[in-house]
Design a protein with these regions (language model features):
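Glycine/tryptophan-enriched, flexible segments
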Residues: 3-188
Length: 190
């Protein structure tokens, strides 16, 4: 099953985290032909003398969609992570699926739009629990609980952060109809 596969292959990815300033490796050596192609498709726009309200009115977007109550950006994502650690994490395993309790991380919109990295969240929660690779219990491979060798909250949160996110990602990549009701398995429809 997927969890068993993930447990057997995850350690390398936990050890090898993204570089903090990976774009610096480019040394500003962009392929000029790619830049030209992008500029031909999306013409550069000078906003200096533009009335922003007029500009937005002319965009072909659904203007009935209301403004989100969630403030985006990295600093707000970090505030939400800290709020979760201070107010929800201690009850995560028990109440994360209960919408009337404030135990879920509420980080999904920040993950979705790339405003905070799962690697950063993993590192912060791991440090909170003093978790290390040596904590892993290889006898628990494939099990929902116990493999991480940590607290119930840590086990539950990592199952969501890593296992279910990866499963969702791979489902979207491998199933053309992932966004259709007909793609749901029979057990989920019931």
């Amino acid at each position: 099953d997927f969890r068993r596969y993930l447990h057997k292959n995850l350690e390398d990815f936990i050890i090898e985290t993204p570089l903090e300033n990976s774009l610096e490796l480019l040394n500003n050596k962009f392929d000029q032909s790619q830049i030209k192609t992008v500029q031909e498709k999306w013409k550069p726009y000078n906003f200096k003398n533009q009335n922003i309200d007029d500009f937005l009115q002319n965009l072909n977007i659904d203007k009935t969609v209301e403004i989100s109550s969630i403030n985006g950006g990295y600093s707000n994502a970090l505030k939400q992570l800290n709020k979760f650690i201070d107010n929800g994490y201690e009850d995560y395993a028990k109440f994360s699926s209960n919408p009337s309790k404030e135990a879920s991380s509420q980080l999904s919109p920040y993950f979705h739009s790339g405003q905070i990295s799962t690697h950063e969240v993993f590192e912060k929660i791991s440090n909170l629990e003093s978790w290390t690779l040596e904590s892993i219990d290889p006898k628990m491979v494939g099990r929902r609980e116990g493999w991480w060798g940590s607290t119930e909250n840590f086990e539950s949160f990592m199952d969501e952060l890593i296992t279910w996110r990866e499963l969702g990602y791979h489902t979207c990549v491998r199933r053309a109809n992932y966004d259709q009701y007909s793609s749901l398995p029979e057990w989920a429809i019931k």
